Amino acid sequence: MKLNKIKIAIDSPAGAGAGTQSKLLSKHYNLFYLDTGKFYRVLAYDKIKNPDKFNLKYIKKRIKKIKLKDLNHKKLLPNEIGIEASKISKNRIIRKLIDGIQKKYAYSPPKKYNGSCLDGRDITYKILPDADFKFFLTANIKTRAKRRYMELKKLDKKIKFNDVFKSIKQRDQSDYKRKISPLKKTKDSILIDTTHLTINECFNKMKNIIDRGVNINRNSKNLKLNN
């Protein structure tokens, strides 16, 4: 394993912490970060705003034009976008088109980075099956719903916890049972239950595993770490 080409794959059900930890690890190890689910959220947003023109021809053109900055827009965060994105991600043709783009970023990140860190469905077994480190984060549904509720409340003060809870439950059933790229833990993924862990506690647990795996420290010549 080359330290300057480290690859990390993280998956989790909604609200378990994959996104948060991926960002923290990417910053610490100077890795290119990609939230793969955001690609589907971009399409979901387009479908909701312009349902009449949302067809395969449009989708193919739109996917080619998606830029990294498009993935970070706040307009992609609402719950309705996530629900629609989950539906779109079940389309085999759309998924194949997006998979190609994600693999390109995963295996050929910009040169200024030490490698890549991706989170999302099927990352550990389809997009980055040979990742140096694979993590599957989980937490009980009440905890996950609470986290998601606090996040969404910043966007919509009228949102209700029960609605978020039901949404998370439906999302779980959909993600775990769908035929195309279902949510699942691979045998070689490290399971971490974040139910009773703070963000920092979870980060340190994952960091320690990675540090032990590559046997590095802050004085390594091959991997420059960020504070």
Per-segment meaning from a language model:
Residues 116, 132-136, 189-191:
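Short, well-ordered beta-strand core segments
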Residues 2-3, 76, 82-83, 100, ...:
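NTP-dependent small-molecule kinase module
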Residues 26-36, 49:
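Post-Walker A helix-loop "phosphate-sensing" segment adjacent to the P-loop in P-loop NTPases
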Residues 8-10:
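Hydrophobic anchor at the beta1->P-loop junction of P-loop NTPases
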Residues 39-116, 122, 142, 146, ...:
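ATP-dependent small-molecule kinase phosphotransfer cores
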Residues 13:
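P-loop (Walker A) phosphate-binding loop of NTP-binding proteins
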Residues 19-20:
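Walker A/P-loop
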